[in-house]
């Protein structure tokens, strides 16, 4: 060991010392090629869309998103509410309208049919409006629904159930002719007890479905507003 200026020490050359100038450049080239192949393989294996999702979510969730187990799927799943909403939208509502149609043909009374089809068309129109808003906003990298759009869709989603429940209640419980059908089963009215009770059950099911769909839209947003003390447009 020999001491040089500024207090630094250097090891003297011996028989085991390899001068830096004598190192073959081939090893450096090999290491560079190996690193390049590793990076190429990594770029092929990594799903960059998932990487972007992780980076985006990390801005909201912090480092937790990078410590999620591999078995945990961060992508959206079909929840029970989504399944029930699909059934009520494409199965239950049309089925109730078919019952109203059967009652209109059998009892010569098309009031339930007109009411059911009108509210159903209104519901589908509201749903299409919501989908249009979401598509237009997401296309421009905005939140799915703005505050005004939330209020508008929420009001329309509640308007349908209110109208249906109010009118159907009056037709079932305050209409004298319909009450006679229920109590007397008058054969002159070209109907029977089975059809009467079937349309009553359909009206009840339609009312519950309409109210549930409206609550399904409003409740998460009201809950978020109560918890975060702010209106979150989603």
UniProtKB/Swiss-Prot annotation:
It is found in: Virion; Host cell membrane; Host endosome membrane; Host Golgi apparatus membrane. Its main location: virion. Keywords: Host cell membrane, Host endosome, Host Golgi apparatus, Host membrane, Host nucleus, Membrane, Transmembrane, Transmembrane helix, Virion. It holds the Pfam family Herpes_UL20. GO terms for cellular component: host cell endosome membrane; host cell Golgi membrane; host cell nuclear membrane; host cell plasma membrane; membrane; virion component. It is a multi-pass membrane protein. The chain crosses the membrane at residues 82-102, 112-132, 153-173, 191-211. GO terms for biological process: viral life cycle. Coiled coil: none annotated. It comes from the Viruses. Interacts with gK (via N-terminus); this interaction plays a role in the coordinate transport of UL20 and gK to the trans-Golgi network (TGN), and is required for their cell surface expression. Interacts with gB. Belongs to the alphaherpesvirinae UL20 family. Plays an essential role in egress of virus particles from the nucleus, cytoplasmic envelopment and virus-induced cell fusion. Forms a functional protein complex with gK and this interaction is absolutely essential for their coordinate intracellular transport, gK glycosylation, expression on host cell surface, and function. Together, they modulate gB-mediated virus-induced cell fusion and virion egress and therefore actively participate in these processes. This is Protein UL20 homolog. It comes from Gallid herpesvirus 2 (strain Chicken/Md5/ATCC VR-987). The gene is MDV032.
